[in-house]
Amino acid sequence: MKTPRLLQYLAYPQKITGPIIEAELRDVAIGELCEIRRGWHQKQVVARAQVVGLQRERTVLSLIGNAQGLSRDVVLYPTGRALSAWVGYSVLGAVLDPTGKIVERFTPEVAPISEERVIDVAPPSYASRVGVREPLITGVRAIDGLLTCGVGQRMGIFASAGCGKTMLMHMLIEQTEADVFVIGLIGERGREVTEFVDMLRASHKKEKCVLVFATSDFPSVDRCNAAQLATTVAEYFRDQGKRVVLFIDSMTRYARALRDVALASGERPARRGYPASVFDNLPRLLERPGATSEGSITAFYTVLLESEEEADPMADEIRSILDGHLYLSRKLAGQGHYPAIDVLKSVSRVFGQVTTPTHAEQASAVRKLMTRLEELQLFIDLGEYRPGENIDNDRAMQMRDSLKAWLCQPVAQYSSFDDTLSGMNAFADQN
């Protein structure tokens, strides 16, 4: 981060409140890592903290870990560097904590650790990127056929609680064609992390997976760092020429962690209680994936909606940055329709770049069919639909059940791209 210091400045904490420490530290920078020791004459590091704010004569730090056992007598030692982690092929098949430490393995180690990387870095420049031109085959009919994603695209999965976000993530991990899968579980329940690890243990792709976690009981700065670490791991494999798929679950809890850190450092709340820096930091993370001349990172970010009816400024901000979104419907989930993707409310902004004219024409025909069925649903609910009055409506009603069955797909069922196009073509020809 900076040149080596000739003098090292130390400080005692003036205030410890939860995970926040205030001290008169000089010559430190935002994001810098500080070691915490029992005394100035002791070398044992008992904790670490990260600089998150600078005020007049005081520095605000956020603990990495909890404050249990700390006292007024501990000493803060600036390290002059930002938080970094060792990454390499050794993390494949492993579970990492927010500091990059391997806490569990579900496959044997394949290679030694090879490189130390700072986890909070700027996105790649436009000159180093390449366009999204190749489709990403996910094996999910609704996505491959009607919402085709591209290699290097960034997609959001928007849903309220209980709509099947985790189920869709499992499908994408099991069926998507990629070299490496990096999963970041940010602010999730401990039970969900356990279940996800169990799923990966049983997966035939476990040797390709890396899981980074920071559960809801972790300090805010740890939750922020976990998302950055997951992205850093994905960037490492992209630089090795790999095709990487990155999952962050969830961006909503990452944004809340950013908010907590910003408020603790003294920032004032702005939109919906979020300080302005949160809206600066979101694109810094979301712009890091993408395709470069070496490899690619295709990213899926889940966003938890507070309500399907009310406007959500954080969800709107994330949606505006990404290259598309999959909207999961609570109504479809309640009907047992999984994956509960509301195709008409979802969009892939690179669809036209990764599909053939024939594919695009067929998808348009199926969308028109779905739009007509949605319009007819009101008449059906009111008992006003009369067969024989409109031949186009009758044709759409005849295909309704088969279209619904085609859009539904069990978690373990894989649909090849050719089969998906063939099934979609059957609906387009009848429409």
Curated annotation (Swiss-Prot):
| One of the record's GO molecular function terms | protein-exporting ATPase activity
Q: What is its main location?
A: cytoplasm
Q: Which domain of life is it from?
A: Bacteria
Entry's localization field: Cytoplasm
Q: What is the effect of changing residue 385 to A?
A: Can still secrete the T3SS components early substrates (InvJ/SctP), middle substrates (SipB/SctE, SipC/SctB and SipD/SctA), but shows a marked defect in the secretion of the effector proteins SptP and SopB (late substrates)
Q: Which GO terms describe its biological process?
A: protein secretion by the type III secretion system; proton motive force-driven ATP synthesis; proton transmembrane transport
**Pfam families, per database record:** ATP-synt_ab, ATP-synt_ab_N, T3SS_ATPase_C
Q: What is the effect of changing residue 223 to H?
A: Lack of ATPase activity. Defective in type III secretion and invasion of cultured cells
Enzyme Commission no: 7.4.2.8
Outcome reported for the amino acid change (mutating residue 191 to H): Lack of ATPase activity. Exhibits a decreased ability to form oligomers. Defective in type III secretion and invasion of cultured cells
Family matches, as PROSITE patterns: ATPASE_ALPHA_BETA
Give me the reactions it catalyses. ATP + H2O + cellular proteinSide 1 = ADP + phosphate + cellular proteinSide 2
Reported effect, residue 376 to P: Retains wild-type levels of ATPase activity. Defective in type III secretion and invasion of cultured cells. Does not bind the SicP-SptP complex
Q: Which Gene3D superfamilies does its entry note?
A: 3.40.50.12240
The phenotype of cells or organisms lacking this gene is: Deletion of the gene affects the overall stability of the cytoplasmic sorting platform. Disruption mutant is defective in its ability to enter cultured epithelial cells.
Q: Which residues bind ATP?
A: 164-167
- Record's keyword terms, sorted: ATP-binding, Cytoplasm, Nucleotide-binding, Protein transport, Translocase, Transport, Virulence
Free-text comment on this protein's domains from its UniProt entry: Binding of ATP leads to conformational changes of two loops located outside of the catalytic site. These changes could be critical for interaction with the stalk protein InvI/SctO or with chaperone and effector proteins during type III secretion.
| Family assignment from sequence similarity | Belongs to the ATPase alpha/beta chains family. T3SS ATPase subfamily.
What name is this protein filed under?
A: SPI-1 type 3 secretion system ATPase
Organism the protein comes from = Salmonella typhimurium (strain LT2 / SGSC1412 / ATCC 700720)
